[in-house]
Amino acid sequence: MTQLRIQATFVVDVWDGVDDEKVDGGPVTARVELAKTYTEGDVLGTATGHMATTQGPGGAAYVAQERVTGTVGGRTGTFVLEHRATQVGSGEPVTWAGIVPGSGTGELAGISGEGSLGHGTLDLTVELP
């Protein structure tokens, strides 16, 4: 296995959100379809996926999965990236990102790893066979 730290930047091309039914006094929840382009760094390609979000006066959270198609460290294929964040009040969000086990295809078959995802940035430590 080869271990790599991969860092990449991305832009969000599509953010199509639909609010769920509102609950009096409850936070706003929504479902989002998204598309991204990974533009620089160790990941180059595109991604499409889905996200669920919750936002209220006491905090916010989201969970998402996206299928990334492109190259990682020069290897071509696809994998599914799962990521989430939780924020209490106006504090800093706590984030996590990881590759769904067994989701890699092509030259990325067997890829695994985890790290973090921020506004426009991805930072993972991955293992490739």
Q: Residue locations for each model-derived region?
A:
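Beta-strand-enriched cores of mature, soluble protein domains
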Residues: M1-P129
